[in-house]
Amino acid sequence: MLSLFVVALVSATLLPGGSEVWLARLWCLGEPAAMLWAVASAGNTLGGLINVALGRYARRFQERRWFPASREGLARAERWYRRFGEWSLLAAWAPVVGDPLTVLAGVLRLPWWRACLLIAVAKGARYAVVLYLAQRWLAPLC
């Protein structure tokens, strides 16, 4: 279970990971689905909150040459985020866009409790779907 927590946490940061595959593998090995869901959701939510913290911290360096986003790019991202609002964090589960959304929430200083709630809902839903699909499609193979 600790390995699932770590893989889920790393998968939620800007580092690559394969938490869905590991979750399905542990389910096939007979681990309880509810426990797998809770551990993966907690790890992935914590990883998302690490991204929020990185966004909050990184904003102070935006004038540095090495900062990864241009002033125009950051302004464009802020306009997009303000247009769709904090509810866009419900897409934090999605590959490619989810991690940058959590960083952007930090850059724009979304209150911690709201970031935590929205990210937890998104990540929990993601792993519920993964477990449902594993139970439906992988059961004959396990």
Q: What are these regions, as identified by a protein language model?
A:
Residues 20-24:
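Hydrophobic alpha-helical bundle signature of multipass membrane enzymes
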